[in-house]
């Protein structure tokens, strides 16, 4: 609901359940807190997985209040406080690294963060032209079980050409995760999912622990990485068919990598 109680507030609640995962999400946003341009919001979520693309179960509970303040027509600043509790349980055939992380039990992370967004894209004929830049960091260590820093950067550009019939886009993303106390877990580290890097199965890129070098049988744990970068290039074009068919074509090229682990052993590959 984008106009909750007729006051311009946004309220969202979603439920997703399946054979191997469960997700509950609740969010609220007040765009005119104290009758000024300061926005106040809150996110609350619970996510469980039951051996989803892995040999163990996970639970993730998150509570995040935040404020958003405009910095002109194109830029805005978001500041948030996050409390996240994660748990790994019910392991099957897993390696030493995941076993150690399961034995840690429930871990609570308490952090404060910011995200700075500058969006110069112009809405034109239903498309967007221009440039988008996002920079964000999360500083963990406010009473939780670990202390560290997570940095994310994204830059995107879109451009229409040939009488606005062809759209070119480029997106580059990067992330760095560092800890000064405690260690990262598989629930913290980066994975290049299909919305970041197309063409690979879940967990198909980056460090993994295998009981044999071919990763064919036995242990085969996707561990994720503490660093990642990816570049996505895409062009969309019409097929020359009538518009009412709603069909268009596209080509894309993605290149990226996820790497780096603070804890490795002889069975870890691609770190």
PLM features per residue range, with description:
Residues 1-4, 265-271:
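Short, intrinsically disordered, charge-balanced linker/junction segments flanking boundaries
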């Amino acid at each position: 609901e984008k106009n909750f109680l007729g006051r311009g507030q946004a309220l969202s609640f979603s439920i997703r359940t399946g054979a191997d995962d469960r997700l509950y999400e609740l969010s609220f946003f007040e765009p005119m807190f104290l009758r000024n341009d300061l926005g106040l919001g809150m996110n609350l979520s619970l996510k469980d997985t039951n051996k989803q693309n892995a040999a163990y179960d996970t639970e993730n509970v998150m509570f995040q209040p935040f404020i958003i303040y405009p910095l002109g027509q194109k830029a805005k600043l978001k500041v948030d406080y996050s409390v996240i509790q994660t748990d790994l349980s019910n392991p099957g055939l897993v390696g030493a690294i995941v076993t150690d992380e399961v034995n840690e039990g429930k871990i609570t992370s308490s952090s404060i963060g910011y995200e700075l967004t500058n969006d110069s894209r112009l809405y034109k004929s239903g498309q967007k032209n221009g440039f988008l830049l996002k920079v964000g960091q999360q500083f963990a260590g406010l009473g939780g079980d670990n202390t560290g820093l997570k940095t994310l950067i994204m830059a995107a550009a879109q451009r229409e050409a040939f009488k606005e019939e062809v759209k070119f886009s480029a997106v580059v993303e990067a992330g760095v995760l560092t800890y000064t106390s405690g260690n990262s877990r598989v629930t913290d580290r980066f994975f290049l999912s299909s919305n970041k890097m197309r063409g690979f199965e879940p967990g198909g890129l980056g460090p993994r622990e295998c009981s044999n070098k071919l990763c064919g049988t036995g242990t085969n744990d996707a561990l994720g990485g503490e660093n990642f970068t990816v570049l996505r290039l895409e062009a969309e074009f019409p097929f020359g068919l009538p518009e009412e068919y709603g069909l268009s074509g596209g080509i894309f090229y993605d290149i990226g990598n996820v790497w780096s682990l603070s804890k490795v052993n002889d069975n870890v590959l691609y770190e």
